[in-house]
Amino acid sequence: MEIRDIRAVLFDMDGTLVDSDAVVDRSWSTWATEYGLSPAEVLAVAHGNPAAATVAQFLPDVSDSERAVAGARVLELECDDVSDVVPTPGAHELIATLERLGLPWAVYTSAPNRLAKVRLEAAGISPSILVTIDDVAHGKPDPEGYLRVAELVGVEIEHCLVVEDTLVGLAAGRASGATTAGLKGVPADIRLPDLHHLVQLFTE
């Protein structure tokens, strides 16, 4: 699909619109250490993955209540640490460009609602439509979230561009039927060095 055929842009949050990599690394490293796990092994899957899925993967033998406590601990660590959460390069410019062109945009994130709002506010980004892991039954790589956010935006998914920075997120976008754009070298229909490049594509 050509860029001119795109009628809405659906963004991932962490690593795509919001640079929270350092916070994610710190929070999950602390959590892993507290639970006697390897921070490197946990970090290898934590980025872009729903926190509950990561917790379940590394604590498969604990009770549901213990797993809930572990998940709450991660959320506490992440919500309390926004010291260096910033917009990714080009994020504000791209949003301004989309709004100038009359193209709706929205955010779908694997983060829970509380954390998403904290990070978006820290980065100075205010989506009118936000779908989080709290709003869906199945997180990424399931396409449910992107299908849901496209419905809320009011644009058929085939005319949406999903912008992601992880393989699991792009898998969700691809499965939804959207055109995909990938940051950080991940394979997608459109590969982006940064969001400035997407500004150029929409305005050239």
Regions found by a protein language model. Name each.
Residues 1-8, 96-99, 103, 112-204:
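Asp-based, Mg2+/Mn2+-dependent phosphohydrolase catalytic module
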Residues 18, 41, 84, 106, ...:
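A generic secondary-structure micro-motif detector
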Residues 2-93, 99-101, 112-117:
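N-terminal helical cap/lid subdomain that shapes the substrate entry/recognition surface
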Residues 19, 107-109, 182:
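Hydrophobic residues in well-ordered beta-strands that form the structural core
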